[in-house]
Amino acid sequence: LCTVIHLTACDGTTDPDKVIPDIDTANVVDTVNHMAADSKEGLGQVYYSAKYSEITKELLNNWLENREKSVTYAEEYQKIVAKMGGNAKIVVGLTDKNVIPGLTSGNPAVKGSAKYDVLFKDTSAYNLADRIGVAFVKTENGTVYQLVCLFDVN
């Protein structure tokens, strides 16, 4: 017996970009959008993307597995980013294959220790973003890490 579960939004849509898959992801998207709206610049909203959340998850896995190996990290980063094609780019988050942020950066972070204000440090970069990718990865020792990336897909 096999059961297929399709997430459905309140309005009946099954579009993966319109259905946020879990409460933790929804909380991150809501927090980022509330902080943007409440900022002195009155920054715009970003919209959840299943596709870019998958890219974000791959980036987080690469960070977890290769952050001590800069060459491998950069090579894997390039492979992951290439999947986006030429019409999208990461504008906030893991934006550079040659810069491997430490855990103290606040993004990536241990779940519950994320510093969302780091997403707004460069408001001109934030203003380019229209999609948000959110990822959580549980490691073998049970620690859950999270990463948020903002994408310009226009």
Can you say where each PLM-predicted feature lies in the sequence?
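A well-ordered secondary-structure block
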Residues: 78-154
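C-terminal motif of bacterial Sec signal peptides marking the signal peptidase cleavage site
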Residues: 5-9
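Short, well-ordered surface patches within globular domains
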Residues: 15-89, 130
